[in-house]
Amino acid sequence: MSIESDMIHVEVVYALPHEQRVFNLVVNNHATVEEIIRQSGVLELYPEIDLAKNKVGVFSRNVKLDATVRDKDRIEIYRPLLADPKEIRRKRAEQAKAAGNADPVTGGKPNALRK
């Protein structure tokens, strides 16, 4: 086997609210997700990334740090959620009920046929 056939092209992506960083790398085809992220330099540029806490994925599918990748894969580092989506929906429904924009029983849209 040649050295070139042992190498693959991958991207490491980290997105912030107003910035997206893409790191293009050529790595060994047996490298793990964690090794590739460390090689990319993203951890030095963004010290807030903690691989023990931040989830990672390949093309929007969660993967473990010890997973291997294929040629042309995109490794994504996800930021933690700021708020629980269920809690946000519950608060929004309560506000709609209080404002009279929701059915007081179901919490959904008011039914004009119901009295």
From Swiss-Prot:
Region spans: Disordered: 92-115
Domain of life according to the entry: Bacteria
Signal sequence interval, chain numbering: none
InterPro entries, sorted: Mopterin_synth/thiamin_S_b, RnfH, RnfH_sf
SUPFAM superfamilies cross-referenced by the UniProt entry: MoaD/ThiS
UniProt record similarity statement: Belongs to the UPF0125 (RnfH) family.
UniProt name for this protein: UPF0125 protein VP0646
Organism: Vibrio parahaemolyticus serotype O3:K6 (strain RIMD 2210633)
